[in-house]
């Protein structure tokens, strides 16, 4: 039987850093207001790079770390809600840029759950026996879809990318998964809405900026996501104590605080870096994963159990328990 494992991690963020104090110069806010409510202190904002540029940098790092030539890749999946364009896909641009001529490539649109959804799909591709290895990348330039006059959203988001190289393994590393969607709550978090613009349409103009009902999303995360995480831990057969770390979508520190209490696990097991990057949607979990390997908290030697959990627009939420 064929399984898959995460063998490389990488991340990349734009050089431009915007602090809370910087934002206070262009809108009615302050460092204290943002930090106390979200835990965010700064974020990286792209000035010239597109989403594909960030994803390409991650792909190049993953290949360099692995020693593989790009032609050894079988697939590339990019999770994003801020692609360069509707087509070609961001993944197709990555494929062309790195010369992965044997890989099929496509984008995954599942908002802040996108990386988890894409990773679950990639695991199944390799487990089928038809494919040996591929890249799963979360990449966003959310700065281009934000209304910078709306402080309820503008202070939250940042740009960045992270990803993993997934390849075949004789040992099982993906131990449990749970993926969910509730489209009935979809209007709680929206972006990129398009008007009907044909000569025959009677469509109304719509707001295409990212819009969010913050209270609804907070309640959804604490209620539905915590319930799903508790269920997947039970599904895995692991005791809570056997989980080394939980890497949740980096939306808000208060969500992590509440989640730890709701699930009944030590807060220190919930890794975080939103203070440095803000909410980077599909990129938040792989950036956190890569940084945690970089700083030595995670080893990639098969000795640790981690839980990855994303939640956001759709509404979508999903969790994986992985041995790394």
Swiss-Prot record:
Keyword tags: Acyltransferase, Cytoplasm, Fatty acid biosynthesis, Fatty acid metabolism, Lipid biosynthesis, Lipid metabolism, Multifunctional enzyme, Transferase
Principal EC category: transferase
Record-level GO BP terms: fatty acid biosynthetic process
One GO MF term attached to the UniProt entry: 3-oxoacyl-[acyl-carrier-protein] synthase activity
Catalytic activity as recorded in UniProt: malonyl-[ACP] + acetyl-CoA + H(+) = 3-oxobutanoyl-[ACP] + CO2 + CoA
E.C. number(s) listed in UniProt: 2.3.1.180
Record pathway: Lipid metabolism; fatty acid biosynthesis
Domain of life: Bacteria
Coiled coil: none
Disulfide links within the chain: none
CDD domains, A to Z: KAS_III
Entry-linked Pfam families: ACP_syn_III, ACP_syn_III_C
Cellular component GO terms held in the UniProt record: cytoplasm
UniProt keyword annotation of Acyltransferase present: yes
Active-site residues, record numbering mapped to chain: 112, 249, 279
Subcellular locations according to the entry: Cytoplasm
Region annotated ACP-binding, chain positions: 250-254
UniProt record similarity statement: Belongs to the thiolase-like superfamily. FabH family.
Job description of the protein: Catalyzes the condensation reaction of fatty acid synthesis by the addition to an acyl acceptor of two carbons from malonyl-ACP. Catalyzes the first condensation reaction which initiates fatty acid synthesis and may therefore play a role in governing the total rate of fatty acid production. Possesses both acetoacetyl-ACP synthase and acetyl transacylase activities. Its substrate specificity determines the biosynthesis of branched-chain and/or straight-chain of fatty acids.
Subunit structure of this chain's protein: Homodimer.
The record's note on its domains: The last Arg residue of the ACP-binding site is essential for the weak association between ACP/AcpP and FabH.
Protein name: Beta-ketoacyl-[acyl-carrier-protein] synthase III
């Amino acid at each position: 039987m064929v399984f898959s494992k995460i063998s490389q991690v990488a991340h990349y963020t734009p050089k431009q850093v915007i602090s809370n104090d910087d934002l206070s110069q262009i809108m009615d806010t302050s460092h204290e207001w943002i930090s106390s409510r979200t835990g965010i202190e700064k974020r990286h904002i792209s000035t010239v790079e597109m989403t594909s540029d960030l994803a390409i940098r991650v792909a190049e790092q993953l290949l360099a770390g692995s020693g593989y030539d790009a032609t050894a890749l079988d697939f590339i999946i990019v999770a994003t809600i801020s692609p360069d364009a509707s087509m070609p896909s961001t993944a197709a641009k990555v494929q062309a840029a790195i010369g992965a001529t044997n890989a099929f490539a496509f984008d995954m649109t599942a908002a802040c759950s996108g990386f988890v959804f894409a990773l679950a799909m990639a695991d199944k591709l390799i487990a089928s026996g038809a494919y040996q290895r591929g890249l799963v990348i979360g990449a966003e330039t959310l700065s281009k879809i934000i209304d910078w006059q709306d402080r309820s959203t503008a202070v939250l988001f940042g740009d960045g990318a992270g990803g993993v190289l997934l390849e075949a393994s004789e040992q099982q590393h993906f131990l449990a998964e749970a993926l969910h969607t509730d489209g009935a709550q979809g209007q709680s978090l929206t972006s990129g809405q398009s008007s009907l613009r044909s000569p025959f349409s009677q469509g109304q103009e719509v707001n295409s900026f990212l819009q969010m009902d913050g209270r609804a999303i907070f309640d959804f995360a604490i209620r539905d996501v915590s319930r799903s995480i508790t269920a997947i831990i039970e599904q895995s057969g692991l005791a809570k104590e056997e989980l080394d770390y939980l890497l949740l979508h980096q939306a808000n520190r208060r969500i992590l605080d509440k989640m730890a209490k709701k699930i009944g696990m030590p807060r220190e097991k919930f890794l975080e870096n939103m203070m440095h990057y803000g909410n980077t949607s599909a990129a938040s979990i792989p950036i956190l994963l890569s940084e945690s390997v970089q700083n030595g908290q995670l080893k990639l030697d098969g000795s640790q159990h981690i839980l990855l959990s994303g939640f956001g627009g759709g509404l979508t939420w999903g969790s994986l328990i992985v041995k790394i």
